[in-house]
């Protein structure tokens, strides 16, 4: 199988999987039209489709003087429609040796193109955890940058501004250490039961979680209107703790405390994912939601019918 992808793509748009040669022409036409409509650019490229991979990415910083470092990895395998839903750092599935190899590859890629900025080098890691494949580089600060900030203590936005101002990196690779574990849940205005249909609207009531090891990035407030003309993401809830299991428990508590009235969100689905054995063991691949969505939604439905509120 192969994957058709929009050169200017993002957010899971302009992507088509193709398993049979006879389907390639139609899939190409569909993806090309979607790319033109979404990005104003219909250029496409073709790549090998890695089945059941993990989505592992490395944060890099590069200045104009040739200094390039990475700030560790993130596991972004829990996705819907090729768009990330839950991200964490560091990736539980990586051995120290594999982390070193992938980090070195990310730095080498950035150096090869003379990159200057904060950026993310994204890889697909195959199921046997022996081979990894370059997927793309995001030449910007990403949604999930916060989990890297929490485990490294490095302010990525500040570093990006310093680089843009022409200043040399003060950090060296040996200065970067990963401490603890961080998880981010994206809160999207969408209905998972209706195929993740966007559900913009007015925020009638809003309460975000708080406390030690909790970070919320959002511009929402009670009474505001979430526009239908932009991405459905409404907030990011991040949790940090010394161990991964402590972080999972803290994020569960965050989602129990989070309240938004006015339109549906994916918060309940993310809460169920945090209890799933595959997630707890750190075994999720990009196929996780495709394989388990129905059971996760069914459990949520039974809770709702029984009057139990997560």
Which residue ranges define each predicted feature?
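Acidic/histidine-enriched active-site and ligand-binding environments that engage anionic O-linkages
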Residues: 1-3
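ATP-dependent carboxylate activation and anion-phosphoryl transfer catalytic cores
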Residues: 6, 11, 18-310
């Amino acid at each position: 199988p192969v994957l058709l992808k929009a050169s200017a793509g993002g957010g899971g748009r302009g992507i088509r999987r193709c398993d049979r040669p006879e389907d390639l022409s139609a899939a190409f036409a569909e993806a090309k039209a979607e790319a033109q409509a979404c990005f104003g650019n219909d250029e496409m490229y073709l790549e090998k489709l890695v089945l059941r991979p993990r989505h592992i990415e490395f944060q890099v910083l590069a200045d104009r003087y040739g200094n390039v470092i990475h700030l560790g990895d993130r596991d972004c395998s829990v996705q819907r429609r090729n768009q990330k839903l839950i991200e964490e750092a560091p990736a539980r599935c990586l051995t120290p040796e594999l982390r070193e190899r992938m980090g070195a590859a990310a730095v080498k890629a950035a150096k090869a193109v003379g990159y200057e900025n904060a950026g993310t080098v994204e890889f697909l890691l195959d199921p046997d955890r022996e081979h990894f494949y370059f997927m793309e580089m995001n030449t910007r600060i990403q949604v999930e940058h916060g989990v890297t900030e929490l485990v490294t203590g490095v302010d990525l936005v500040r570093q990006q501004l310093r680089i843009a101002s022409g200043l040399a990196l003060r950090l060296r690779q040996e200065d970067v250490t990963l401490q603890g574990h961080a998880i981010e849940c994206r809160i999207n205005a969408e209905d998972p039961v209706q195929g993740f249909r966007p559900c913009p609207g007015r925020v009638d009531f809003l309460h975000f979680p708080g406390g030690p090891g909790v970070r919320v990035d959002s511009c929402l407030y009670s009474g505001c209107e979430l526009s239908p003309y932009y991405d459905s993401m409404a907030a990011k809830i991040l949790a940090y703790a010394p161990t991964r299991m402590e972080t999972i428990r803290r994020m569960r508590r965050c989602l129990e405390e989070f309240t938004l009235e006015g339109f549906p969100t994916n918060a309940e689905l993310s809460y169920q994912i945090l209890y799933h054995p595959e997630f707890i063991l750190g075994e999720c691949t990009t196929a996780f939601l495709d394989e388990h969505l129905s059971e996760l939604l069914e459990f949520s439905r039974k809770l709702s019918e029984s009057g139990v509120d997560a």
